[in-house]
Amino acid sequence: MELEGRGAGGVAGGPAAGPGRSPGESALLDGWLQRGVGRGAGGGEAGACRPPVRQDPDSGPDYEALPAGATVTTHMVAGAVAGILEHCVMYPIDCVKTRMQSLQPDPAARYRNVLEALWRIIRTEGLWRPMRGLNVTATGAGPAHALYFACYEKLKKTLSDVIHPGGNSHIANGAAGCVATLLHDAAMNPAEVVKQRMQMYNSPYHRVTDCVRAVWQNEGAGAFYRSYTTQLTMNVPFQAIHFMTYEFLQEHFNPQRRYNPSSHVLSGACAGAVAAAATTPLDVCKTLLNTQESLALNSHITGHITGMASAFRTVYQVGGVTAYFRGVQARVIYQIPSTAIAWSVYEFFKYLITKRQEEWRAGK
């Protein structure tokens, strides 16, 4: 993902990422808004962090900068489309990840690796089985990502005007990212619960409405947010590791910190993979909270798992330390292309918006 060097802002100022939202999206958003909206609003990002790029008037529009007239709607649409595409393309791998994180899987659902799991699911359960629950994921990802972008962009500018008038504030970036993540995860968490229950082996749910109705009637509305705090807790270390790894790799692959798509994709993908592997224990706990495997764990616990602490204890009681890293392979494999997909979509929108704006200006 495009996490160009921003001094301290590249790490501390980046927005946090959610489960249904890759860290690459958040990183690219930070770089995108700082380059585009920050300049349009009077922020001096380029002068503060790196020398301005001199552009030949005949070379066409500046590919790195959004037009000054970019609106909140632009960020909402770009975020929604990128989020939906990312989740849809990688959904089969996400299904495999969820199953591999099961603490006590059915003998027919024990997989050695991602490819074997995907092949067996298709062969024994049907071609479209890995896609079950995709509709609720896409429905949740669109509004969640749009809300994230709109909140981050608006709050970042508002706080920057208060903290550092006329410039860019890393504190404002961090605060805006935290608030945006709270809203994003609040919108996405119910969809995550339904999606993961439909992904499990022998899931009794074939339709989203059946799953929603059963969860509501049997466990109450709170079940849709049982993993919310765990999700938020996972995002903080995930984002920190992601940015630190990215900056380290950029120092080697792109020491001049110029616009270099290949270095951004490679660094972002590697950083996402490292962060995904490191935070897998929290993801396992989140999956347990969402799927509520207590029915299969009656020999160890009674009742529902109510929070992150009880989820951590249950995972250890059932599978030991190694259980915290169930599905790590699938999680890493999912994260690498997800980062590239999100980055590519944002770059496409950025280029398209800039090109059309320049064409409109030229035609005036």
Swiss-Prot record:
Similarity comment text for this entry: Belongs to the mitochondrial carrier (TC 2.A.29) family.
Matching PROSITE patterns: SOLCAR
Amino acid composition bias (Gly residues), ranges on this chain: 1-17
Native source organism of the sequence: Homo sapiens
Biased composition regions of type Low complexity, renumbered to the chain: 18-27
Tissue expr: Ubiquitous. Expressed in placenta, lung, kidney, pancreas, liver, brain, skeletal muscle and heart.
Any single biological process term in GO: iron import into the mitochondrion
UniProt name for this protein: Mitoferrin-2
Biological role: Mitochondrial iron transporter that mediates iron uptake. Probably required for heme synthesis of hemoproteins and Fe-S cluster assembly in non-erythroid cells.
GO molecular function: ferrous iron transmembrane transporter activity
GO CC terms in record: mitochondrial inner membrane; mitochondrial membrane; mitochondrion
Region listing for Disordered, in residue ranges: 1-28, 40-60
Gene responsible for this protein: SLC25A28
Positions in coiled-coil regions: none
Enzymatic reactions: Fe(2+)(in) = Fe(2+)(out)
Solcar repeats: 70-158, 168-252, 259-352
Annotated TM spans: 72-91, 133-152, 170-189, 227-246, 261-280, 327-346
Alphabetic keyword roster: Ion transport, Iron, Iron transport, Membrane, Mitochondrion, Mitochondrion inner membrane, Repeat, Transmembrane, Transmembrane helix, Transport
PANTHER family reported in the protein's UniProt record: MITOFERRIN-1-RELATED, MITOFERRIN-2
